[in-house]
Swiss-Prot record:
Transmembrane segments: none annotated. Gene3D superfamilies: 2.70.40.10. The lineage of its organism: Bacteria, Pseudomonadati, Pseudomonadota, Gammaproteobacteria, Moraxellales. Catalyzes the deamination of dCTP to dUTP. InterPro entries: dCTP_deaminase (IPR011962), dUTPase-like_sf (IPR036157), dUTPase_trimeric (IPR033704). Keywords: Hydrolase, Nucleotide metabolism, Nucleotide-binding. This is dCTP deaminase. The keyword Nucleotide-binding applies. Pathway: Pyrimidine metabolism; dUMP biosynthesis; dUMP from dCTP (dUTP route): step 1/2. Homotrimer. DCTP binds at residues 112-117, 136-138, 157, 171, 181. The keyword Nucleotide-binding applies. GO terms for molecular function: dCTP deaminase activity; nucleotide binding. Belongs to the dCTP deaminase family.
């Protein structure tokens, strides 16, 4: 299994729609010249942006977190360019980018160091072969202070690994429950 370069990422995105929308360079400034947390293609990965759509965890209803029976009332919906995550809590969001993963590729997501160095951890499970959709992002605020997440700016990096052989059964073949997801998607048992 080999990690794929910027050339491969560019070709797959431009010719096959692997990443839409696709930024062919590292974007570091907005149209007004203000500094951003970078996004776009890098040497061996793609830095994704967070959409302005968040679900922030709250325990106002004294719910129990149960992945088999998740209570949607545990979240407050926020639509904003900035999301404040309470101390020792978390939020869900989604990428701006829509992904279509090739059958012979596994994609792994890592958080950006800009957030990690502030105690904000991004968690995403691997994007499996032939999975497609907006990626649901989980941000954990590990600090005792409120933490800020910026929509429209880089939050995590996707790494693409191409296998030497094509898998027998892809995520699409299995009818994966998160196939084609749009928006912030809550757990499904």
């Amino acid at each position: 299994m080999a990690i794929k370069s910027d050339r491969w990422i560019r070709e797959m995105s431009e010719k096959h729609g692997m990443i839409e929308p696709y930024a062919e360079n590292q974007v570091r400034f907005n149209a007004q010249g203000e500094k951003l947390i970078s996004y776009g293609v890098s040497s061996y990965g793609y830095d994704v942006r967070c959409a302005p759509e968040f679900k922030v965890f709250t325990n106002v209803h004294s719910a129990i977190v149960d992945p088999k029976n998740f209570d949607e009332k545990s979240f407050i919906d926020i639509h904003s360019d900035v999301c404040i995550i309470p101390p020792n809590s978390f939020a869900l969001a989604r990428t701006v980018e829509y992904f279509r993963i090739p059958r012979n590729v596994l994609t792994v997501c890592l958080g950006k160091s800009t957030y990690a160095r502030c105690g904000i951890i991004v968690n995403v499970t691997p994007l499996e072969p032939e999975w497609e959709g907006h990626v649901t992002l989980e941000f954990s605020n590990t600090t005792n202070l409120p933490a800020r997440i910026y929509a429209g700016e880089g939050v995590a990096q996707m790494l693409f690994f191409e296998s030497d052989e094509v898998c027998e059964t892809s995520y699409k073949d299995r009818g994966g429950k998160y196939q084609g997801q749009t928006g912030v998607t809550l757990p499904k048992a």
